[in-house]
C-alpha cells in the first residue's frame, strides 16, 4: 500500500459558549486528564476519533466520561449546543457547522492530533483518471490549508 498524508488536525474541546464570553485571550490548554472527567458527547465505537481519544486517555491512566454516544458531527454539535456535554472535534468541523459562534474552543494538553491519509495499492498501477483524482484531492487539501 502506498500512503500519502493529506491532513493533520488538532482536536479541541468544544463547549457551549456562555452568553457574552470573550475568546480574547484564549483560555489556557486543558489537561487531557481533566477532560476525561467532563461529560463528553462522543461517537460510538468503532470510530477513529473515539478510539484515539480513548487510547490517549488510557495512556494517562484515565477513561472518558461518556454523556452520550452519537454518530455525526452535526448531531454532536447540536447536543453540545443543547448543553448535553462537551465534545472533542477539529476546529474545521466546528468552523464548517451551521452555528460556529455558538461554541467555545479550548486546546488540550497534550494535544490530540488526527491524521487523514490516502492509501492506494502499490501492486496495481493507478489509471490516468485515478491519478488525476488523487492529485486533485491532494491539491485541494493543500489549498484549503488542511
Where on the chain are the PLM-derived regions?
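A late-sequence structural motif
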Residues: 20-21, 104-146
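Generic preference for hydrophobic
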Residues: 3, 13-14, 40, 88, ...
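Hydrophobic hinge/microswitch elements
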Residues: 46-104
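Short secondary-structure boundary/capping segments
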Residues: 2-5, 31-33, 58, 95, ...
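Conserved sugar-transfer catalytic core signal across GT-A, GT-B, and GT-C glycosyltransferases
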Residues: 9, 31, 75, 114
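Short beta-strand-centered segments that line the small-molecule binding cleft or hinge
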Residues: 1-16, 23-24, 29, 81-84, ...
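Secondary-structure junction motif
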Residues: 15, 21-24, 29-32, 39-60, ...
